[in-house]
């Protein structure tokens, strides 16, 4: 396993220029999920990811339509009996580039300055999507795949993933795994890989509090009849 790891790292290093070129190509797609004018770009980005999976020779690759933007799925099975399964989550949508005046270059024309690459989505999270895909490529080129791997790459993370819950509910068997990996986090330092193991999600609630049907005199009823505003403050 150690030799395979070393070989994979060597492969990644020798193919770094190509990997970077492909990332730049991905970054030129303005896959802005909040903007209806970019619906075609969302489909283009989803197909681009699916094409990456196909080029790797994954066992199954599919672009699933949703009520919003597509979900891209891919999986590759290990030949090792009883191998664990990891599900890698990612998203191909990005935030709008506005305010444009804060950019020194076009947000969708990647520019490299030293070791840094500047473009919308470079770090959130097209860079991580490509890094994960290319890491798998490096492993496959250097030996056998030790685990089963699945990818779920959505296009609505930047708008709260409104259709992801339903998609997951409908495909529980397909998405079954031993653990999940979300590379959409930060690092302590550029040269120190970091795993975030407690990441909060989103939860939406609507609270309704019913009170008196008409105004009550605060001097007479204050403190006796619970004020809905006070009850809400206590709940929050």
Which residues does each predicted region cover?
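Acidic/His- and Gly-rich active-site-bordering loop/insert found
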Residues: 2-120, 139-145
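Flexible loop/turn segments at secondary-structure boundaries
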Residues: 35, 70, 95-96, 158-161, ...
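Broad gene-expression machinery/nucleic-acid interaction feature
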Residues: 71, 148, 202-204
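Fold-independent oxyanion-binding glycine-rich loops
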Residues: 90-92, 114, 155-156, 183-185, ...
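Short, conserved micro-motifs enriched in small and acidic residues
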Residues: 115-130, 158, 222, 226-230
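Acidic/histidine-rich catalytic neighborhood of metal-dependent amide-processing enzymes
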Residues: 123-198
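Midchain, well-structured core segments that form catalytic/ion-binding scaffolds
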Residues: 165, 172-236
